[in-house]
Amino acid sequence: MYDYLKGLITRITPEYIVLEQKGIGWQLNTPNPFAFRTSAMEQQIYVHLHVREDAQVLYGFPNLDQRELFRKLILVSGIGPKGALAILATGNPQQVISAIEREDETFLVKFPGVGKKTARQMILDLKGKLGSLLETIELPSTEDELPLFGVHPYKHELEEAILALAALGYSEKELEKIRPLLEDNDKLETTDAYMKQALQLLLKLK
């Protein structure tokens, strides 16, 4: 069983990153690929190997807490790896854990593929079992805390974010509703920043 991979991130797409290690490029599906950056320095990515009948898929996470929450989410009936990635992509697992503990179905059904039945199942399966994660996960929750990396605000950053959100399962109708709000926000400079702001807006739609 793999625990983590350490290498150079050589490619970032809307669905996955490629981590090169000793001449081998590992394709890692991640919640938000644009939270990573290509770099000449080695990076350590925690991984989860998901085995299906037709494929073996590696999922990558920047820290152990995200991987642990992912593993708990995919144990819930009705939530597969893609659904778990969409939930984690908000960049704020605290919101998700808090919603489960409060039995807030209204919040949980805002994620792609999560209906009332699945939201109820999440609460039944996970309530009271995520306390340690809630204490250790500390991620940005407001726009002012989003990290900006000094990338010029070209439109392709927004388009990359839209593609990544579509890959997570958000509909074209939902994305078109928030696009004007993203286009008018001159504080957003990177694809990662667009992603995080877009996800917060999407959670307010329903």
Swiss-Prot record:
A GO term for molecular function: ATP binding
Region spans: Flexible linker: 142-152
Keywords from the named record: Cytoplasm, DNA damage, DNA recombination, DNA repair, DNA-binding
Subcellular location, record wording: Cytoplasm
Region annotation Domain III: where it falls in the sequence: 153-206
Region Domain I: start-end pairs: 1-62
Spans annotated as Domain II: 63-141
Domain of life: Bacteria
Summary of the function given for this chain in its UniProt record: The RuvA-RuvB-RuvC complex processes Holliday junction (HJ) DNA during genetic recombination and DNA repair, while the RuvA-RuvB complex plays an important role in the rescue of blocked DNA replication forks via replication fork reversal (RFR). RuvA specifically binds to HJ cruciform DNA, conferring on it an open structure. The RuvB hexamer acts as an ATP-dependent pump, pulling dsDNA into and through the RuvAB complex. HJ branch migration allows RuvC to scan DNA until it finds its consensus sequence, where it cleaves and resolves the cruciform DNA.
UniProt-listed NCBIfam families: ruvA
UniProt domain comment: Has three domains with a flexible linker between the domains II and III and assumes an 'L' shape. Domain III is highly mobile and contacts RuvB.
Family membership: Belongs to the RuvA family.
Name the record gives this protein: Holliday junction branch migration complex subunit RuvA
Organism for this UniProt entry: Lysinibacillus sphaericus (strain C3-41)
